[in-house]
Amino acid sequence: MLAGLELAVREVNDSGGIVGRPLELVVRDTAADPQRAVAAVDELARLGVAALAGEYHSVVARAAAARADALGLPFLCSSAVLDALTEQPTEWVARLAPAQSHGWQIYADFLFSAGHSRIAVAADPSVYWASGARILRDYLAPRGGTVIELDMRALDPTAVCDELVDNRATALLLLVGHPEPAVSIVKSVRRDQRLAEIMIGAPAGQPEFAEWVTLLGDDSAAIPFLRYLPERLSPLGARVETALRERLAEAPSFVAFEGYDTVAFLADVLRSYGEDRARIAESWPRVAVEGTRGQIQFSRTPDISVWQWAWTPIQVVDRDPAEPDRFRILHAC
C-alpha cells in the first residue's frame, strides 16, 4: 500500500502539486494495533493534516475511523473491508475497498458453483474472521450448504486434518493470520493423504503475498482468494503497474493499486475543494476520478455506515500449480 501511496504522491508533485504546492505524505505505522492507530490519528490531527489515507487491517481501520469521525478528520480508507467501519453513519469516512459482505458473498457463490456444500473454516478469534464466517453461513445455509467452524485456539494443524475428515468437508477456508498458522495448516493438509481431494481457500487474500510462495513452494498454488482488480487494467492501470513493478522489484498486489487510487482521489478533491476538512468530507459524493481500476465515485450503500465506492472490480484467483508465480482468474465480477 505504501508503495502505491508514495508513487501517486510523486506523480502529483511531478505534475505541479496541488495548486502549485507540493503534496506531503506523513506516514505512521499502525502495526496492526488499534491503539496505535488511535494515537496516530490524534497525532496527525494535531499536525494539521488535511485528510487521512490508508489502512489495510480491518479491525485497526475501524478504530481509526471511529477516532477520525469523532475528531472531524476526513478519512479515505484504502483497503479495509469490514462492513461496520463505524458504529453510526458518518460523513467523515469513505472507503475504496468493497465491503466484506459484498466480496465474501461473491466468494461463497464461487464455492457453491464449484460444488462445495460442506465447508470448514479454520478461524482465529477476531471480529473480522467472525464476520466472514457469518457471511459465508448466511449465503450457503439457504442453499443447503453447511459451514463447520474449527476454533484454532483449540486445534493444532494435525487436529484440523482429523476434523476435516470427521466432518466430511470438501473445502477448508483459512480465516487465520499469515504466515502462521496459515502456512502450517496448508502444509499439514497437503501432506495428509486422506485429504487429497479437499480444496483449500483463503478469501482474505493471504496467497497474494510473495512470501506465501517462498514459504510453501508448490503447496502455495490452487488456493483461491479474493483480489480487487479488473480482468484487464486500463491504460492508467497498466502504466501504474509498470511503475510499481519497478519500484517493488516484483509484481504489485492489488493493495498497491488501492494505495495509488487513494491519493489520486484525494489530490483531485484538494485541487477542487481546498484543504478545509469539512469541505473535503462534503466532497465525497461529488467527485468522480478515473482510478487504476475504474471510475471512483462514492455513494451511500445499504447497511454500510461510510461513503462507499460500489464497487471495485472483484476476482477470485489462485496461483497456477504449473507456475506458482502466475495467477489464474477463476471467477470475476
Regions picked out by a protein language model, each given a short descriptive name:
Residues M1-C333:
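Extracytosolic ligand-binding ectodomains
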